[in-house]
Structures are given as C-alpha cells and as structure tokens.
Amino acid sequence: MIFSTLEHILTHISFSIVSILVTIHLITFLVDEIRKLYDSFEKGMILAFFCITGLLVIRWIYSGHFPLSNLYESLMFLSWSLSLIHRVPYFKKNQKFLSTIIGPSAIFTQAFATSGLLTEIHESTILVPALQSEWLIMHVSMMILGYAALLCGSLLSVALLVIAVRKNKKSFFTSNPLFKLNGSFFFGEIEYMDERINVLQNTPNTSFFSTFFSTKNYYRSQFIQQLDYWSYRVISLGFLFLTIGILSGAVWANEAWGSYWSWDPKETWAFITWIVFAIFLHIRTNVKWKGTNSAIVASIGFLIIWICYFGVNLLGIGLHSYGSFTLTSN
C-alpha cells in the first residue's frame, strides 16, 4: 500500500514537471531571447529524471520483477533512458544546445506514458512463466537503451538535414514563416546570425559585411560538424546496445520457446532496424558519405525505430504482442 501510494505521488509529480517543461519549451519556441528559461528547463529535466528513477525502483520492489512488463513501464524506462542520454552532451563545453534538441524526446515520451491513455495498464501484474527469467533485465533493458540512443542520434541527424537544407535553399526557408519559426526553436543562435547579416546587407561597407557573412558560414559549418560528430557517436552506442539486446533475446527465446529466431513482426523489424544502422555506420567510414548523406540514412532509421518499438507492438500479434496489453498469467 505504501509503495503504491509513493508510486502514485511520483507519477503525478513527474507528470506535473513534464507539463511545466512543455510550457517552458513552448515559450522558448516562441520567444528565443528568454535565455534563463533554458536553465529552468535543464533543472526540471534533472528533477523529472530522479522522479522517474524513484518510480521505477519502487515499482521494481513491490512487483518483484524489473518494471518492463508492459507498454507503460517500457515507455517510462525509455523516457528515463532518453533523459540520461540527453545529459551527456550537456556537460561538454559549448554543447548545451545539443541537449535542447534531444530533451523534447524525453519530455513527450514521459507525457504520453503518464497521460490518461495508458491508465488501465499502470498497475503492475505477475509475469507469464516464460518471462519470469533473469534474461528480462538483460534483453529488454538493452533493447530500450539501444532505442533511446538511436533515437537521440537520429534526431541529431534530422537536425543536421534541416540545417543543410536551410543552407542550400535559404531563399525558400527565409520566405516561409513556418520554417523560420522552427529554426528559432532549435537553432536560435544561427537565426540570430542571419538577422545580423540581413541588417549588414543594407550598409555600404561591403568588406565589413563580408566579414560577418563568413562568420555566419563558419558558425553554421561548426554546428553541422558538431551534429555529425555527436550523431555518429550516439548512434554507435545505440547500435552496440541494440546488438547486445538482439543476441541476448535470441538466447532467451531459445530457452523459453525452443527457437533462437521466429521471424515474428517484432523480431523482423528489430532486424531491419539493425540493418539500417549497420548501413549508416558502414557508409560513415567513407569521408565522402559523411554529413548529409549518412544523415539521410539515420533519419530513415528514426522512423523505423518508432515502427519497431511502438507500431509493431500495437498490432497484437506474434510472441512480442505486449503493446497495450498487460502480461498477466492465467
């Protein structure tokens, strides 16, 4: 009873924090000049991370098994993983802007998990016999950590593509207020440099303008390089987790069902995900394919991950059909 009450309190606290963080992000989306809100956002992310950690630990204690038995628990663990990974670039010098790209993923994942849509599966239940294994922690945690890292890395690649398209087709994006608004959301510093250059274009001192124009291109190129750098490294980490998760899952499947691989929808899409990011890592070794070319592959992988993790589960077929259904024993 005490554990259930504590979990209930932490769930509401984390949901309240997430609601506030969404509001802060919307404000910074519309008014990029309010810099102090970014610090509030990061502090809120830390507090939400500890709330989720406490929630998962409490749920683990009173349920008697690692909290990864249904969609609600896996979403909370995914949100925890995204929050953890989002802190990595934040501690690096001058890399705080990367955390503002990754952060919203953790926010909206947790918001969906704690919303009323999944209320009926918030209660923890007894696992079916096949899942009462030590492999549950190894397999599922590695898979979700892999999904989280791959999602973060892919999101950075999507951001890289947006910047590259803005660079190549500036006239289209600057004339479209919707894209200009999106630019101020993730890339406020670059948008600020664009405005400075537009002002300088009206000055007679062309050499002064040329200096600032080259400065703008320099910062844009540096930003693209940082996105490419972090995207590659985070995806490499996620690929390692995904590989360990697939291999451990194959061993567990052989113990539980007598077969290493059954080609059910979940396994098939996990294999497709692995292939896509293996291609990304392979072409990334070629200097000519770095940057936008490899980012296209990672962006495709971003969609495939969500199909593999979320979409396939909701089909309700195969050995992994635990999407919106609780794994209870008869």
Swiss-Prot record:
GO terms for biological process: cytochrome complex assembly. The chain crosses the membrane at residues 9-29, 44-64, 65-85, 97-117, 143-163, 234-254, 263-283, 295-315. The keyword Disulfide bond does not apply. InterPro entries: Cyt_c_assembly (IPR002541), Cyt_c_biogenesis_CcsA (IPR017562), Cyt_c_biogenesis_CcsA/CcmC (IPR045062). It is found in: Plastid, Chloroplast thylakoid membrane. GO terms for cellular component: chloroplast thylakoid membrane; plasma membrane. Keywords: Chloroplast, Cytochrome c-type biogenesis, Membrane, Plastid, Thylakoid, Transmembrane, Transmembrane helix. It is a multi-pass membrane protein. It holds the Pfam family Cytochrom_C_asm. One of its GO terms (molecular function) is heme binding. Belongs to the CcmF/CycK/Ccl1/NrfE/CcsA family. Required during biogenesis of c-type cytochromes (cytochrome c6 and cytochrome f) at the step of heme attachment. May interact with Ccs1. NCBIfam families: cytochr_II_ccsB. PANTHER family: CYTOCHROME B_B6 PROTEIN-RELATED, HEME EXPORTER PROTEIN C. This is Cytochrome c biogenesis protein CcsA. It comes from Jasminum nudiflorum (Winter jasmine). The gene is ccsA.
